[in-house]
């Protein structure tokens, strides 16, 4: 990403000839990729980048100049443009999970609404059925209203909702730690971009710039869930590659509340609430498990939180199985 020019002195190396000419060494190495927070993908071919090292022998020392002009896609972090026409601004919607089934592709919102969606791309084909998964959903702010759902792990989704609703967590999360580290190193977070999709995995980039010198920029490859969590806490723009937005985006065709069948009217209001039916409320059970998981995380009882997370997954799987059988 960046061009590094610094002398490297190796006094133990003695040139055979005094005043030797500069020699060029070309090699092709694997493109350096940050495995930030375990960002690993399977089935992705590593890209190569050609790097030139110039060695100058002078007074029994070697001066090495490293120059890398591209990050593999023809753009450098120093030259990134926040108004790039290839990207569209987006915002995070308060969605908690997505699923695909007989009713189509559904997005469950934090307030209980269910959004039924269809592919924006007519050639997107029929989505396979799958159980509810935690997700982060981005809404395009270019007037189209397209949604880009990104399936993530449970914890990044929960922490994102906590940040969006200003829920205070007793101990700093890793996203808060990263934000403070960036500040103390004299940088500021500028922008997050969802750049591409490889097979079923989305990729994102986090752009930083030196405080007081916006032209000095660096960028990191991150998982979208991590990049978006940082963006929300730093209150910076989140952009999506236009091709991804229009090819993978979903259009909302129906929006409504979760409704339960009302009993026959007998002239009294709220009869269903006044007389419990004696059956356990599955939503209440799910909420209680989720609440206990969050409480364990808040109190740093991570082993217990992992157990509640597993119980939550098992509960949701049984609930969905019961729904379709």
From Swiss-Prot:
Subcellular location: Nucleus
Coiled-coil regions listed: none
GO biological process: defense response to fungus
Alphabetical list of Pfam families matching this protein: BFN_dom, UVR
Database matches in InterPro entries: BFN_sf (IPR036104), Bi_nuclease_dom (IPR003729), UVR_dom (IPR001943)
Cellular component aspect of the GO annotation: nucleus
Molecular function in Gene Ontology: nuclease activity
Keyword Metal-binding belongs to the record: no
Domain called BFN: residue spans: 117-252
Disulfide cross-links: none
Domain UVR: 284-318
EC primary class: hydrolase
Induction or repression: Up-regulated by pathogens, abscisic acid, etephon, salicylic acid and methyl jasmonate.
Disruption phenotype: Increased susceptibility to fungal pathogens.
Alphabetized UniProt keyword annotations: Hydrolase, Nuclease, Nucleus
Listed EC numbers: 3.1.-.-
Biological role stated in the UniProt entry: Bifunctional nuclease with both RNase and DNase activities. Involved in basal defense response. Participates in abscisic acid-derived callose deposition following infection by a necrotrophic pathogen.
Family as reported in the entry's similarity comment: Belongs to the bifunctional nuclease family.
Protein name: Bifunctional nuclease 1
Taxonomic source organism: Arabidopsis thaliana
Gene name of the record: BBD1
């Amino acid at each position: 990403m960046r061009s590094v020019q610094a002398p490297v002195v190796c006094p133990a190396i003695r040139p055979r000839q005094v005043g030797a000419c500069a020699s060029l060494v070309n090699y092709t190495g694997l493109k350096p990729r940050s495995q930030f927070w375990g960002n690993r993908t399977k089935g992705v071919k590593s890209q190569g980048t050609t790097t030139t090292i110039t060695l100058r022998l002078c007074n029994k020392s070697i001066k090495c100049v490293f120059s890398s002009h591209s990050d593999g896609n023809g753009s450098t972090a120093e030259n990134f443009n926040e108004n790039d026409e290839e990207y569209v601004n987006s915002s995070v919607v308060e969605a908690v999970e997505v699923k695909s089934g007989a009713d189509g592709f559904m997005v469950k919102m934090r307030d209980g609404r269910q959004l039924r969606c269809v592919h924006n791309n007519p050639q997107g084909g029929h989505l396979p059925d799958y159980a509810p998964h935690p997700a982060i959903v981005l809404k395009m702010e270019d007037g189209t209203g397209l949604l880009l759902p990104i399936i993530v792990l449970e914890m990044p989704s929960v922490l994102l909702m906590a940040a969006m609703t200003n829920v205070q967590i007793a101990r700093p999360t890793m996203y808060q730690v990263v934000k403070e580290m960036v500040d103390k190193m004299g940088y500021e977070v500028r922008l997050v971009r969802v750049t591409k999709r490889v097979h079923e995995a989305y990729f994102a980039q986090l752009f930083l710039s030196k405080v007081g010198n916006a032209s000095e920029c660096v960028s990191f490859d991150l998982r979208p869930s991590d990049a978006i969590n940082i963006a929300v806490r730093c209150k910076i723009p989140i952009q999506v590659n236009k091709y991804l937005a229009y090819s993978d985006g979903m259009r909302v065709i129906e929006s409504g509340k979760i409704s339960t069948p009302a009993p026959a009217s007998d002239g009294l209001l709220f009869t269903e609430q006044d007389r419990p039916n004696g059956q356990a409320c599955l939503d209440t059970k799910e909420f209680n498990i989720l609440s206990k998981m969050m409480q364990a995380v808040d109190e740093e009882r991570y082993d217990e939180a992992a157990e509640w997370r597993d119980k939550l997954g098992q509960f949701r799987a049984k609930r969905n199985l019961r729904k379709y059988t």
